[in-house]
From Swiss-Prot:
UniProt record, GO biological process: chromatin organization; spermine catabolic process; thermospermine catabolic process
GO MF annotations in UniProt: flavin adenine dinucleotide binding; oxidoreductase activity; spermine oxidase activity
Lineage: Eukaryota, Viridiplantae, Streptophyta, Embryophyta, Tracheophyta
Pfam families: Amino_oxidase (PF01593), SWIRM (PF04433)
SWIRM domain residues: 53-152
Protein name: Lysine-specific histone demethylase 1 homolog 2
Species of origin: Oryza sativa subsp. japonica (Rice)
Length: 763
């Protein structure tokens, strides 16, 4: 997803947000967020009027950077407040902003309402209760992945009837939603088409598994108030600021003259400012013009970038703009391409040490996920939802959350029954879904400048301006000499047709052209990998943008639920933060709140629940998958364990006992006359069905059971000698959901350890 250390300056669009100037408030936010303890103590001191005003203003800036209006209520807040407070909400807004700032000051532990009440006057307790409840429910506070935020309800949470939710996709949006829903007390299962979590956030390991390489979303863009920064802080993962220096090189290896570079940078940003004025002048007519066409008209009108070298440098900046938007400038809407700039998060752009997969796996912890379950059909109606995956397996639940990428929705590879509303289909069609590809390389050593994180290369041909135009160095965070070449714009589309060996040869030619004249030998990489995101049927592209004819409203339409049964999340449903990793995560938190509200509303209306344990059971499918390849079998007993190596004798596991269940007792058999058998043929058929009982056992206990002579003895030893309680489907899921997830992860880990798999080039 989109990121760049040399992101195009787009300040012309920030006039509506003049009260927030990133360059002026970054230091203040850093000071506030970086010293939680001293700030809390200061709240308890007697502050002067000026000090309190200063603190209130800083907290308002934090709220603003989180997407809250600085002096207004969110639409969802107004109905929660008494009419007099809603009419004059200043006190509530100050309290709300204080809660947001307090949470962000130290997000490693939950922020209970009682702690907030200790820092404000008692007369505001009611406002604290409303604001704290709203912010926690909406996922603005008290979310995360540390031990303090497990994927289960808090011990003091109220008991509620648990609705069931199927989540399509284990990317950042799906995992964030699933984790939040589990904390709300709902029943959740995630269906993921890949054999791994993360979706378009994909950290692989090259060079003998030593170096972490980002093939998908890579940079945390704007660390201030970024929820990904919250997760990193909770996990204690260090962040590396992407340094600003980004030298440019000609295609023959010469360094671009600094004066020329600065001149064209100014020209580029001036063209963008004039493009903003052009659309204001054209008004409605701008809706049908592309950003590329507008910039080219302006370039010719002002007669800038006329020489070959000037044009090549300007093209580099245009390629960088195409990278930021994952789309060709000829497709981007002049009228709306930068509609999200006013929400852009402040602060440095950062790399995460060890790769973004660390965040993904932390989000996965405790969340039940079934992998290699490609969704083909989603049926939704008054009775609930039914999802069919490739191979015909069916899952049913009360509600479903679809986090499929926009590219998948565009491809119509998922059938919706009934069809999605026409306005949603039209929004899917209008929005753009572009492409960014990469060539990732691990070298024996770092031969480039270790004091920079990025450098760029110009191209002669305009159609190829995005081919290997920017290089990212990950040697500071990856554990190896990792260099990644980016391919954007038209070049990204053509790149999908290029043989990986040819692509690697071109990249090495560029690097040798840059460093050879400096006397530096460019070694062959130890290992390399080329992405093919456009050819990947599980995403069909990289991230969204606003195409000609579209607008930010289409993001909102894509986020709309269907009859409170079918919900949608993902970066392409987040109008404020599209095309970003944090936008995906925030959309998942948003939908978790909507699903909880829909669930509670349905219960309050005396709705007949369509629970997980009814009909085709969700948990039945989960357990069937676990026992497809049992670790041990004997008679009617099967065993699966959470160990990774067989030496872990105390590793917990599950035993499954297969039994026959006559559903019609002999005393209830239907008496018939004549020569017919005294047996109901339907009952005879049902009598042949089986059911399962489950028990938690260790590997050591399972070995003891296997030594018994028969199944009857095993049951006696299990229940009497070992004192183990047998459970049905529902109890097993309620009691053992975390163990089920652990066994599933262990099974996948053991498969990986059975032998190294060949690394395929591409995705």
């Amino acid at each position: 997803m989109s990121s760049s250390s040399r992101r195009p300056a787009r300040r012309a669009a920030l006039t509506a947000r003049s009260s927030y100037d990133e360059s002026l408030v970054d230091a203040e936010l850093e000071s506030y967020l970086g010293n939680a303890r001293s700030r809390r103590i200061s709240r308890l001191r007697r502050l002067s009027a000026d000090e309190r005003q200063r603190e209130t203003e800083t907290e308002a800036l934090i709220a603003l950077s989180l997407g809250f209006p600085i002096d207004e209520l969110l639409p969802a807040e107004r109905p929660l407040l008494p009419a007099p407070v809603a009419a004059a909400p200043n006190d509530y807004i100050v309290v709300r902003n204080h809660i947001l700032a307090s949470w962000r000051a130290d997000p490693r532990v939950p922020l209970p309402r009682s702690r907030v009440q200790e820092t404000v006057a008692a007369s505001y307790d009611n406002l604290v209760a409303v604001a704290h409840g709203f912010l926690a429910r909406e996922g603005h506070i008290n979310f995360g992945v540390s031990a303090a935020f497990p994927a289960s309800p808090p011990p003091d949470a109220p008991q509620r009837l648990a609705a069931s939710v199927l989540v399509v996709g284990a990317g950042l949006a799906g995992l964030a939603a699933a984790r939040q829903l589990l904390r709300f007390g709902l029943r959740v299962l995630v269906l993921e088409g890949r054999a791994r979590p993360g979706g378009r956030v994909y950290t692989t390991h090259l060079g003998g598994d030593q170096a972490a390489v980002e093939l998908g979303g890579s940079v945390i863009t704007g660390i201030h108030t970024n929820p990904l920064g919250v997760l990193a802080r909770q996990l204690g993962i260090p962040l590396h600021k992407v340094r600003d220096s980004c030298p440019l090189y000609h295609h023959d290896g010469r360094t671009v003259d600094m004066k020329l570079d600065r001149s064209m940078d100014l020209v580029f940003n001036t063209l963008l400012e004039h493009a903003t004025r052009l659309r204001e002048y054209l008004k409605k007519a701008a809706e049908g013009i592309s950003l590329g066409e507008g910039i080219e008209r302006l370039r010719r009108f002002y007669k800038v970038a006329k020489s070959v070298e000037e044009r090549e440098v300007l093209d580099w900046h245009l390629a960088n703009l195409e990278f930021s938007n994952a789309g060709c400038l000829s497709e981007l809407s002049l009228a709306h391409w930068d509609q999200d700039d006013q929400y852009e998060m402040g602060g440095d752009h950062c790399f995460l040490a060890g790769g973004n997969a660390r965040l993904v796996h932390a989000l996965c912890d405790g969340v039940p996920v079934l992998y290699e379950k490609t969704v083909k059909r989603i049926e939704h109606g008054e009775d609930g939802v039914s999802i069919t995956v490739e191979g015909g397996q069916v899952f049913k639940a009360d509600m479903a959350l679809c986090t499929a990428p926009l590219g998948v929705l565009k491809s119509r590879s998922i059938i919706f029954e009934p069809e999605l509303p026409e306005r949603k289909l039209e929004a899917i069609q209008r929005l753009g879904f572009g492409l960014l590809n990469k060539v990732a390389m691990v070298f024996p050593h770092v031969f480039w400048d270790e004091e920079i994180d990025t450098f760029g290369c110009l191209n002669k041909e305009r159609s190829k301006r995005g081919e290997f135009f920017l290089f990212y160095s990950y040697h500071t965070v990856s554990g190896g000499a990792v260099l990644i070449a980016l391919v954007a714009g038209e070049a990204a589309l053509e790149f999908e047709k290029v043989d990986p060996a040819v692509a690697l040869h071109r990249v090495l030619g560029i690097l040798k052209g840059i460093y050879g004249p400096k006397g530096v030998t460019v070694p062959d990489p130890i290992q390399s990998c080329c992405t093919r995101w456009g050819s990947d049927p599980l995403c069909s592209g990289s991230y969204s943008h606003i195409r000609v004819g579209s607008s930010g409203t289409d993001y909102d339409i894509l986020a709309e639920s269907v009859n409170d049964r079918l919900f949608f999340a993902g970066e392409a449903t987040n109008r404020a933060y599209p095309a970003t990793m944090h936008g995906a995560l925030l959309s998942g938190l948003r939908e978790a709140s909507k699903i909880l509200h829909a669930s509670e509303s349905r219960l309050n209306s005396d709705y007949k629940k369509y629970a997980l344990q009814k009909s085709i059971r969700l948990i039945n499918n989960v357990l069937d998958d676990l026992f497809m390849e049992p670790d041990l079998e004997c008679g009617r007993f099967s065993f699966v364990f959470s160990y990774i190596t067989p030496e872990e004798e105390q590793a917990p596991g599950l035993a499954r006992i297969t039994l026959e269940k006559p559903l019609l007792l002999p005393s209830k058999k239907r008496k018939v006359k004549g020569n017919q058998k005294d047996q109901d043929p339907v009952a005879e058929k049902i009598d042949q069905e089986v059911f399962y009982l489950y028990a938690t056992v260790s590997q050591e206990q399972a070995t003891e059971l296997l030594e018994c002579d028969n199944d009857k003895s095993r049951i006696a030893v299990l229940c009497k000698d070992l004192g183990v309680k047998l459970m049905g489907y529902d109890s097993t899921y309620d009691v053992c959901s975390h163990l089920i997830s652990s066994i599933s992860r262990a099974q996948k880990a053991r498969k990986r350890l059975q032998g190294p798999k060949s690394l395929k080039t591409g995705l």
